[in-house]
Amino acid sequence: MELRDRHVVIVGGTKGIGAATARLAAAAGARVTLTGRSRTSLDAALAGLPQSVVGELLDFTEPALVAVFAGRIAAPDHLVLSASSAVAWGAFAELAEAALERAFAAKFWGYWRVIQALAGQLPASGSITLVTGAAARAALPGTAGL
C-alpha cells in the first residue's frame, strides 16, 4: 500500500498499536492525523512523532464531537480505529453492567460513529482498519476484556 502523500487518520493513536501505526505511516510519507481523548496523552504521543503529524482531541463516545471532528479534518485516504476501551476487564461474571455498557459504547458505537462520519469521504482506493487487542485472538483464563 502506497502511503506517500496519503492522509491517514488514526483514532486512538496516542499509545500502543495506534502510536506505532502513526510512526510507521509518517515514516512512509503519509500525512497523519491522530486522535486522543486527553491533551496530556496527545501531547506525549506527538512529542515522539515527526512534527508533520497532527494531533486532534476526540472523545468518540460523543456524537456531536465526532461530527465536528469529521467536518474539521481533511478527507482521509485511510482510517485506522485503534482506541482502547479498557474500562471493562476482569472475570466476566463479576463485571459491572455499567462498565460493560461504557466499554461497548466506546469500542462498538464509538467506532461506528467515526466510520459513519468519515466513510463517505474515503476514496475508492481507501481503507478502514479496525484494530482489536490480543483478547480477540486468545482468551486469558478467568477474564473478559472489552
Per-region residue spans from a language model:
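Conserved mid-core segment of classical short-chain dehydrogenase/reductases
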Residues: 84-101
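Catalytic loop of short-chain dehydrogenase/reductase
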Residues: 99-104, 108, 112-113, 127-146
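Conserved glycine-rich cofactor-binding loop
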Residues: 7, 14-15
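Rossmann-fold cofactor-recognition segment
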Residues: 49-64
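Hydrophobic positions on the long internal alpha-helix
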Residues: 80, 110, 114-118
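Conserved glycine-rich Rossmann-like NAD(P)H-binding loop of the short-chain dehydrogenase/reductase
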Residues: 28-44
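Rossmann-fold scaffold of SDR-type NAD(P)-dependent oxidoreductases
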Residues: 11, 76-85, 130
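Conserved Rossmann-fold cofactor-binding substructure of NAD(P)-dependent oxidoreductases
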Residues: 61-74
